[in-house]
Amino acid sequence: LIKGNIVVIPAGGRTLFLEDTGTAPMLKATGEIPEWSGKEFPATFGQSADDDGNVYVQWHRRDNAGRVDIMRFEGDTLKTGDFVPGTDTNIRMDGLLSFSPVAIRGKEVFRVKPETDRGLIQHNISTKEIKALSGAGAIAPPVLTKRHVIFGGLDGTLRIIDLNSKSQRETKMARGAISAPVAIANGRIFASSEDGTLYLLGIPSDLEMPMQRLNASALRSPLSGKLANAKYDWYTNYGNFAGQNANHQDLKPPLRMRWARRLEGTVKHLPVCGGGRIYTHTAEGQIIACEQDTGRLLWRKWFPDVYLSFTSPLYINGKLLVPQAGMKKSFVRCLDATTGNLLWEAPFTGSPSWSRQFPPVVAGKVAIYASGSGDYAPQGSEKPYTFGGEPVVPKDGSEVMSFIYSNDNPYYPKNHHPRLWAWDLDTGKVVWEKDFFEFGRGGNDCGICILDGKLYYSVFFGYDAETKRRRGLPVENNGLTCCIDPQSGKILWQTNEYYVTSKCTLSARDGKLYIGGYNKAKAGTEDRHVWCLDANTGKLVWTSDAVTSALNVVSVGEKFMFSNALRGKGNVFDSATGKVIYSIQTNYACCRFTMSEPYVLGANMDMIDLSQEGKLVSTGPAIDSRECLGAVVSNGRIFYTSQASGFVVSQTYGPESKNLPPAWQVR
């Protein structure tokens, strides 16, 4: 961004103001976003400036937290801390983040978001008035003319809004999303689409719409090498249907950057790979496929009414299954992985909240998913139903859960039922359903996996038996775990003694089932444990040493067994006894580590060698200010998606890192 002789650039979570002195740049000031919804340096998703020299910064810190801050010079002093009213978002507020620079005219600020009914918003800085001018979700920055504001949507439609009458004209131009700002010259509008075509709109026009379109979704650089085979795909959030979160692909230093690309969304799932593509699902409803080898965008789809759905895609046999949750409606959607075209969708209920990233699991031709039911709002009606802040009780006094709720749930609302759905993979028709409400209330804090042709399901009901009794809820059980025939839904065994305790799914290997979690399993104790059950009988094999917590999943490799703790130690277990062999003082937040033996991979490509008692052998580049996501190894490459900073990157390793240069050097 250039304003006069001042160059404004984002760098490392700051905003740098460089003065062009004619012979050299001189740092004039460094702008920092003040503490709000966190302290870490945020990512900049867009910068703009007005005629008075004010700089507008759309930033994101974590988990939907961000806003458009205004920086300005008063004399030689840079003033920060002001922001455009109505642009602030976080997990407790109603509204999604924006990922684009704003357009400014006087005191009016125009801003797009990938959010239904709030696609283009007009903010008045003086009156604080907010007007929704278009409901179509968008990430392409709006462009102002004398009488209109123009933007392209994620649906491939160009929209022109009259600033006086607020009337809107729509032109469906593209098969792909329009993600870049339009250009305007000589009364004509030029719009580039992700379908690979440049479109022109205007009168007169002597150009015709293209009859033969580019096949932009086709692979141009397929994977090659000894690990390109599908059996080496990291095809679901936890690596495979057993939830093992581990593989062995001869990972070793040194690492080398292969490619990097921007991501206009927030995520909490790990990269998913299959068919030569890497797939990403943003919490705002975008599903994106890129070429694994180069990072080139292949296709992007956006579905309305998705709201903070931190869920993972699943790749299986040319199909992509993605749970997309929202407060208005939720669907598991099945897409053609090659084109992104929708094949079928099936409704479900509930909120994935922070930590239920898992997509469906598949047994034969049956796709199975677990969730809850009940009522949700941006903020819950009781403290246990919230993630901080003051509860908001509906006028009718009903119980409402925050859509992004606490990780510490002693009990759940009365109308929350634990649910399981099974659909035909080819048609989306229901094969069977289960509701476990007779055993307890809850459903969203759960886990599923498949081992040896059997489905395993575990759910948490809360640990506060006394409060559940007073509220008229079932008190006998704090949770349950069961083994199910995935074809019929028949229960093969069930126990109420051992169960996940939120923020963790199930994992299984060699006839054993592994259960972790974040919460206490029952009132009166602060200890947490990992349980190991016999997968054939449900009987306890061992209880681990006490741990701070066991988040996300217990990673179970051929040799090593590992779990992370929230702001605590990561632990390496003896898989035969549950004894902690040694601990790693990672002090990460809720990092979703993965294992590619003998290493575990953390945030910012941290590579920790478990065969050397947790030695850090490689790290970086540090592209993310948060610690929520680790990297994965798939098909002989490393893939990493930043939770906060809007990047997806890939690295090569070992001998390949010497021979395969970054993609941008060989184009």
What are these regions (language model features)?
Residues D20-T23, R72-D76, N124-K128, D162-K166, ...:
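Short loop/turn segments that connect beta-strands within beta-propeller blades
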